[in-house]
Structures are given as structure tokens and as C-alpha cells.
Design a protein with these regions (language model features):
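Pre-Walker A (Motif I) flank of P-loop NTPase domains
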Residues: 23-26, 184, 211
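Extended helical coiled-coil dimerization/tether regions that scaffold
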Residues: 112-191
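Conserved hydrophobic alpha-helix in the ABC-type ATPase nucleotide-binding domain
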Residues: 230-235
Length: 318
């Protein structure tokens, strides 16, 4: 069954109809202000009741930050529309929940705030250090092209009270450190910004349920272009193994060029058009990075013989 969201008169979006694709990694790109963040908030609502409250912030002033539009969700012939009432609550027009029919176990929205840039202090260690899970060590080393994380340790800290169990493995109860000599370590507080952002992202992905929808804002955040490409390889493998649907918002040409599933959001007249399977060169050109599609070297030859000679010896010339 087709699954679709229609956003009307919300923030900068007058109208957008977005059809959800199947499993795999999908790149969503477009100019700033085209509606990527708004779309992610609407997608997050499929499994998160507080998505509108945390994503559509308001003030107490009567003429500021008003949301007068609507968000409609479709699964086949079924539909539910949410609007914001005078009470301040977002309410559906019908009392039936079609969100379960989207068939996602959960929706995980990894934005550029809070947990993405979180670093754990070492003020109150609770237990002796333990080796870090092999999957995390391998992923960090592989994506960052290093071996510095091979002996990384995990230290349980903070308040371990929890109703859900496994409190010692929660990110807020976990600190990481790397040994530099006998009985000497440096903690994650001294990791580079790119390292801590990647560590937190991987932690979130690993703790996501299979068959879930994952929304990642600005995947390239603080990462070298080569690391971005290796991270994309990792995410493609995770999506395949765990049946994940991953949406990534980005302006990174390195990321856009690595994926065939590029979705371009483009403002046309009075609406946001959605272009699926968009060629990377078109997407890059649309977001104003024309230089990234231009050749590094242009060689002009006199005739076909010169062209053949150049092609035969191209490696030594270029």
C-alpha cells in the first residue's frame, strides 16, 4: 500500500506531498528553508507522540509562531489529518490510528542537537572499566580510517536506577576512554568533535529496533568527506541487515554522489516538488554547488589522432 504525507501551510511549506519509499538509505536534499526539517518532524510523528511539541516550537505571544495549517497521513485509502487547536494541542480529525499501518517498529530522529553532541563526564564512576563492544570499535576504526579506538574502554557512571533494565549500557550512563599508557587514559571529553558526533550517531543506530525508520539531520556534521563516504557504506549495510528505512538530510556532495536514492525537494511556484531518484549532478546543481560538478581538467585536442593518443596515455597526463 502507498504511504504518503501531505503538508499544507506549515512553516515555509505551502504544499508538499511526500510518498514514503521502501527500505534502504535515501538522501534528501534541497536548498536551506525548503522544508527538510519540517518533513522530518512530520515523519517522526508516525511513532513519537511528542514530535510536534518538540519540533514545532511556539511562544506565548499571540501573533508569533502560529501553526494554522494541516498535516495529513495516508496509508492506502485511509487518512488522518492533524491540525493545531486553540488549546495548543495537535489533534486528529478522526479517532483511528493508522500510524501502525506504516509498519515501522519505531521512528528514531537523530538531529543536530542534544544527544548528537553529548559528552559524558567522569564525575561519578559506578563500576570498573569494561571493554567496548567489538561492533563499535570496528565501526569507529573503519569509518575514521584509524586503529586508535581498538583498546577503547567503557565506564559506567551516573544514576543507574531504571525501570527498563540495562541502565549501565544507556548512553547517559556510559563514558568512553582510550588508554595512552599504563593506567593513563583520555576520556571522550577530549575526543575530537567529529569523533564524538560519530560515536553518538553509531550508538543511536545500534540501539534502534529492526524494521524502523531512522531520520538523520546533516549526516556530514564534523566529518571529513572520506569519512562521510565510509559512513554511508556502513549505513547501507545496516539498512540491509536490519531492514531499516533511513532518510538523511544533507548538502554534502560527497554523500549525494555515493547514493542512487537521492530525493530532491525543490520550490516550484507555490509548492515544494519532490523529485525521486534524482540524478546526483542535478541535485548538486540545484543546491547551488555547480563547481562540484565541473571538471578538474579540460583537455582540448586538435584531431581524432591526438584524442586517441591522449586517451592511451591519460594516466600519465592526469
Amino acid at each position: 500500500m502507498d504511504r504518503k504525507i501531505i503538508i499544507s501551510q506549515i512553516r515555509n511549506i505551502n504544499y508538499m506531498a511526500f510518498k514514503l519509499p521502501g527500505e534502504g538509505v535515501h538522501i534528501i536534499t534541497g536548498e536551506n528553508g525548503v522544508g527538510k526539517t519540517t518533513l522530518f518532524t512530520c515523519l517522526s510523528r508516525i511513532c513519537n507522540n511528542n514530535a510536534y511539541r518538540t519540533g514545532f516550537l511556539t511562544t506565548n505571544l499571540s501573533n508569533y509562531d502560529k501553526y494554522m495549517g494541516s498535516i495529513s497521513y495516508f496509508v492506502g485509502d485511509e487518512k488522518v489529518t492533524y491540525t493545531k487547536r486553540t488549546s495548543g494541542r495537535w489533534q486528529p480529525d478522526v479517532n483511528k490510528n493508522i500510524f501502525k499501518k506504516f509498519n515501522y517498529k519505531s521512528v528514531v530522529h537523530i538531529n543536530t542537537k542534544n544527544e548528537r553532541i553529548f559528552t559524558q563526564s567522569m564525575d561519578t564512576p559506578r563500576r570498573n572499566p569494561k571493554p567496548v563492544d567489538v561492533w563499535l570499535i570496528n565501526a569507529m576504526n573503519s569509518i575514521l580510517n584509524t586503529d586508535k579506538f581498538s583498546n577503547m574502554i567503557r565506564i559506567t557512571v551516573g544514576d543507574l536506577r531504571s525501570r527498563t533494565g540495562n541502565a549501565d549500557k544507556r548512553r547517559r550512563n556510559t563514558a568512553f576512554a582510550i588508554p595512552i599508557s599504563r593506567n593513563r587514559y583520555y576520556t571522550e571529553q577530549n575526543f575530537s568533535f567529529g569523533e564524538i558526533v560519530l560515536l553518538n550517531l553509531l550508538y543511536d543506530i545500534e540501539n534502534t529496533e529492526d524494521n524502523s525508520l531512522v531520520l538523520i539531520d546533516e549526516l556530514e556534521m564534523a566529518l571529513h568527506p572520506a569519512a562521510q563516504v565510509r559512513l554511508m557504506d556502513y549505513l547501507n549495510e545496516m539498512a540491509k541487515q536490519r531492514h531499516l528505512t533511513v532518510f538523511i538530510s544533507t548538502h554534502s556532495t560527497s554523500i549525494i554522489k555515493t547514493n542512487k536514492n537521492v530525493i530532491l525537494l525543490e520550490r516550484k511556484s507555490n509548492e515544494i516538488k519532490v523529485f525521486y531518484k534524482c540524478p546526483p549532478a542535478k541535485a548538486i546543481g540545484t543546491i547551488g554547488m555547480r563547481e562540484d560538478t565541473m571538471a578538474d581538467i579540460i583537455v582540448i585536442v586538435e584531431d581524432d589522432m591526438a584524442k586517441a593518443l591522449f586517451n592511451a596515455d591519460r594516466k600519465s597526463v592526469v
